[in-house]
Amino acid sequence: MRHDQLFLWYLADPTHPVYVGQLQLVDAGKGVSLQYGTDWLANGFPLSEDLLLANIEHLPRWKGMAVGALDDARPDRWGERVIQYIDKPARLSLMEYLFYAGDDRFGALGVSTSAEDYLPRASSPLPRLSQAQQLSEVVHKLSAKEPINNIERQMLAAGGSFGGAKPKALIDIAGEPWLIKFFNNEPIDVPLIEHASMTLAKLAGITVAETQVVPLVGEHALVVRRYDRKGSQRIHCISAGTALRAETIAGQEPNLGYPTLAQLLRRVGVSKDGVNLQDMQELFRRMVFNILIDNTDDHEKNHALMAVEPTAQGKYRLAPAYDVLTTNSGQGYQEFIVGLDQRDSTLANAMSQCTLFGYTSAQAAAEVVRVIQVVNGWRQHFKTLGVCEADLDSLAERIDGDPLLSQRQNFNPADYATPAARTKRRSPFA
């Protein structure tokens, strides 16, 4: 079945869905628009800053995307692959991907075939943690394009809800939906290393999504607690990319980076008790940590905001960090802009705009020292969690390689005791 028109619902309380508006396929099948319904215009809230409460058809401003916050409700590479394999839609437009992502997607939005009742794609109960081994085997079958039976299809179907390139699915742990991420034939034990990286980040004062390692036959999987769920309630969330594009003037390229996101949090974050300032400063620590552990996959989809007070002026909190792990690339630049030297993976670059995160230069330098002290203990921390010596040696080539180790060793907070004119410094990766 082709879907040229579908309907958007808000599922903060899944037992009482609220109709949001109508979705329409546009741009020759490469975009999806939204027009709010009358009740949502009267009682709802803008789903993102580019989706104001106006009685118009909101059109996507970038090709190949659904409009505004709706783009975060669609799957990405792995999810699309699952949908193609499981559902086999007659057409592969954005509208099909939005619909077949099902009911339990990221955030609190749902897609229905009806504006009168919430009628999402039919779904089965999530597999339980005790079925993780079987689920892993099904994922490997899909990756190898091997046939699977109906029971295996039902187990895997929830994997169409999420983005990213690597194999994942939803799994039930004690009645709560968690994300499970599988080993993907990498040369190192990525699930275990991600758990070690996330728990190391927590030691550095970074709020992270809860993770657990699941032992499987010959490998590990990683389960991640969903921060967009609180009991039976769902939290409306948007990616950093959506938030930053929403404030971008039409025709211009968005400034996708840490400093810009910090300034957005200053403006639209929860201001009561200085919560937005706390989030801005945590974002700085996250940036420094990512640089020092060689996490260069810190792109716009790997940061998110939670609308904890959807109808308030200052409604957003910085979501817990996720997908934090050393990428072992040594490329010397981040995906997200760091500072005046753009994406260069240097502490000097991180410090270049530190005042945009609500710090003085001296305060920011003290935070860098704190993160350095934690990262200096990375090897023992990883070893304690079971990372093997071969993987530790492989990671050490990057984390303790000269470009990053020299920055940890040579960073001097006294250099930032008083503001001074900045000169561009040569990258240690050059």
Describe the residue ranges of each PLM region:
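Phosphate/dinucleotide-binding and metal-coordinating scaffold of catalytic cores
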Residues: 1-296, 300, 304-430
